[in-house]
Amino acid sequence: MNANETKVERFLETTKVQFVIPVYQRNYDWKKIQCERLLDDILEVGSNDNLKVHFIGSIVYVHDDAYTTAKINELIIIDGQQRLTTITLIYLALYHLVKSMEEKSLADEIMETYLINKFAEESEKLKLRPTDNNDYALKCLLKDSNHADFESYSTLIANFDLFKKRITKENYQTIRQGLAKLMFVEISLDRSNDDPQRIFESLNSTGLDLSQADLIRNYILMGLSRIDQSKIYQNYWEVIEKFAKDETTNESKVSEFIRDFLTLETKNIPNKGSVYIKFKEKYPNLISSMDELERLLLRIKKLAMHYNKLLNPKKEPDKEIQKQLEYIAQLEINVAYPFLMQVYDDFNNNVIDKSTFISILNLVQSLTWRRFIVGLPTNALNKMFMSLYDKVDKNDYLFSVQKSLLQRSSTQRFPNNTEISNALKEKDVYNIKHKNTMYFLERLENYQNPEYVKIEDCVNITIEHIFPQNPDPKWRMELGIDQCDKIKEFYLNTIGNLTLSGNNGKLGNKSFSEKRNMNVDGKEQGYSYSRFWLNKSLREKTEWNLHEIKERTKMITERFMKIWEYPDIQIKSEDGNGEVNIFEIDDQSDKQLEYYVFCDQRTEVLTTSQLFCNIFKQLFDLQPESFFNTPIKDRINLSNKIEVYENKAYEQLNDTYFMCTNYTNAEKIDRIKEALSILKLEDELFIKYAENESNVYVV
């Protein structure tokens, strides 16, 4: 490796050289603010005689001693392509400006010194060779500053237009002087002696510049030959990038997709900033075998095709499946993607039929929506869906998934109908995410509805409070102050008091009879004239009070049970694996343990004392600072002095700290629960009692 400080001008004026941006590099994506900052720096240094140089970072390239047929030396840029491309655009804007000023000599100098290899073949003429789409855009700009031949959007062209606008007859000489002062560190690597991948990682160790997907793409492609790079990129990675894109926002989701892929492969959920590291750990020798690499990428590409439909439901041609995918997208059930991608693959391979697939999609919604209604934490879903596919029995597909979900307990449970019925009486379903409220009402409205009513995208349909948020005085006269206050405090935003209206602004705070009977110009306005199912029961009502809200809640609850069904299956008690969440333990007698599972790691133990000591040691390793700023410290009598325990039993947590263990088994279990709750790890500890009931212990 050679590193030298070099002037940008000197670097670009090198003859018979081409700076190649390899396919594994991310696309050119400098934003307006970055371009303007660089140009401002150039103007500042160009106008100040006291500033001799301006440092712009580094450019790293691999020198393979590879030459084209025209003896053009190819330098593979592995870091610095954004700066190099942007500076090329500035020179290109300068060229077109001085050309328009009829300064032919200066225009030719800029063109032939910094932009092209004058005597090279057409394909090798540009000194900078970006990836395919940018290469075409750059060639269009070289011919025509108005880029008439380039019809689609290009960041490269947008930034050129910015420079074209800002570089003028008044400042172009200052810009030339500033460009002449630009300095960078030129780092030249020799593939036979240096490790470009390792150097690339060290240059991007902060992760600020590149996404996890960028790093993984580079990891896959960088060590391959140019021919293999092109093959793998075009046949696999480019397709993966296309599939893993949210077409509504035009946002790349490759990093998220690979995270979901690793989740289903490893049964562990990587941190968002560790996806690249975990990918490398899972696949450490990718380029040692092209066959293995292609097999892996073929699987990833196949799953990406299904991921594309989860992100963009309209890509699914079947309208019934598409509708369920739209619901899942509306609820943002992204945590289910590792599971659903595999189910989608089974559907695609005819392992399951359409009916089963739709039932699975409905089941995922039922689980998620029921849990939301009763207020269960969403973080528990991550681990549920992470391993759910492992429970699939392909001979009894739907039942096996239902069984697995119904076997969960505590915060991972599938809420039953009684829980739902109780929750809907009080649940505020108005002051939640608007899209969730609309999902709820849209599904209620359209159950077995022959004419589907699309609510979310219809600006004329709004959520209506039957008893208004700011009631007219007539309400107090009709219901009395006490009942009005009670409804407003406890029932205002419950499902029993919410409906849909195409005229919410007009219904407003009027009395119930006025809301029901409103009919101006014969148009649909009041409840009596509404076509919505949600308003059907309101047509015959003569009053609206607490009793009516409760009755309507019962009616909607019955409909809820039909839409978000609780699986109607029988599960034998022996179907479970015997693992019990620590918070489900009621009987704290001295039964012998077999093992516990904490954070997906199984550990053999026999006694509650062993469990107590092990768990607190693991918790202390995970979050030591939390032991000192929460009640945990006092609950286990944490200290760095042994003498404080006198004749009491104690355990060493680490090299410095100790804790008291002089508690009954019930007290030990209680302290474990308290610590898990404080640290928000309620779903992480499961225990398994020994099956031989004769085995008991004292401590």
How should these model regions be labeled?
Residues N2-S274, S513, N519-W533, S537-K572:
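Glycine- and hydrophobic-rich flexible loops that cap the catalytic core of alpha/beta enzyme folds
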Residues E9-K16, K52-K71, K169-R176, D190, ...:
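Active-site-adjacent bridging/hinge elements
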Residues E44-N73, L106, D393-L538, I556-T557, ...:
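Betabetaalpha-Me/HNH-type nuclease active-site subdomain
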Residues S47-L51, S100-E103, L162, K169-Y172, ...:
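Intrinsically disordered or highly flexible coil/loop and linker segments, enriched in small
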Residues I76-R83, R176-L179, S188-D195, Q212, ...:
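Secondary-structure capping and boundary motifs in well-ordered enzyme cores
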Residues L84-S100, P468-I481, L619:
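Short active-site loop/helix that positions an aromatic residue
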Residues A213-I216, L221-F440:
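A cross-family structural signal marking well-folded subdomains
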Residues E551, E558-V699:
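Intrinsically disordered, charged low-complexity linkers and terminal tails
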